[in-house]
Curated annotation (Swiss-Prot):
This is WD repeat-containing protein 5B. The keyword Repeat applies. InterPro entries: G-protein_beta_WD-40_rep, WD40/YVTN_repeat-like_dom_sf, WD40_repeat_CS, WD40_repeat_dom_sf, WD40_rpt. WD repeats lie at residues 39-78, 81-122, 124-164, 165-204, 208-249, 252-292, 295-330. Belongs to the WD repeat WDR5/wds family. May function as a substrate receptor for CUL4-DDB1 ubiquitin E3 ligase complex. One of its GO terms (molecular function) is histone binding. It holds the Pfam family Beta-prop_WDR5. PANTHER family: WD REPEAT-CONTAINING PROTEIN 5B, WD40 REPEAT PROTEIN. Residues 1-26 are annotated as: Disordered.
Amino acid sequence: MATKESGDAKAQLALSSSANQSKEVPENPNYALKCTLVGHTEAVSSVKFSPNGEWLASSSADRLIIIWGAYDGKYERTLYGHNLEISDVAWSSDSSRLVSASDDKTLKLWDMRSGKCLKTLKGHSNYVFCCNFNPPSNLIISGSFDETVKIWEVKTGKCLKTLSAHSDPVSAVHFNCSGSLIVSGSYDGLCRIWDAASGQCLKTLVDDDNPPVSFVKFSPNGKYILTATLDNTLKLWDYSRGRCLKTYTGHKNEKYCIFANFSVTGGKWIVSGSEDNLVYIWNLQTKEIVQKLQGHTDVVISAACHPTENLIASAALENDKTIKLWMSNH
């Protein structure tokens, strides 16, 4: 698969599903540190803002999920129950529930308000590494070191489908905005798009030199896929054509599965953690690095963007163990 930038590199990419596109914001972002959240006792693995914008969930190698206030970083509650470290956490669309993926080979479904574990999803034969809800939040998807992707029914906790997805650990799984498609990425170097209903593989995106795919995510409107590979590269794909549209570089990512994100509340940015302890922000259109956020003292494994405010949460590994909230005026 050609990885050259196809077509007009200056083509404006609309990410939002809304018809009324906001005009490009000309100024670069000016994110500044708002607060540092201390609570985890080992490496933080994932941070996610709730869809309603109220909360931030963090997961950690300390086997805990902590819920914080999204705006002030105030500690809310801790969710206990996993026997081994947690790699990922994700919110339901109504912000009432969370799902977590753990090295104990299970996923757990949590009630946000009570902090109670509602269900434990068992079936993977190795570490569960990544998880997400579909938009109606009646299904959960998970990826594992057992090289499969599983689709679970939230109501019953039963596994509905197992996709023999990859030939190496699955690093990331995500539904598109309609819930009709699933994207998965793997250390086997492949990014695959699946029909969520049938479990059929519709398309495979592959790079020339096949570096491990460490992260994948659909854009908010579902037209594009953002991939991260362990050769210090992020790429934006038009998956319907199987073409790479944009390449983002300058950060360091050769070892860890670092979360990346679309930031659409102000300007249109790509945001990622990095192994040089920084958060990188690129202009989505021009691919230029517009800001680097300095403050963490270890690899920034996860960066999340707030759904409505110009707010970024970042989290770092075991020499740091903290979460930082950053805010921008635009």
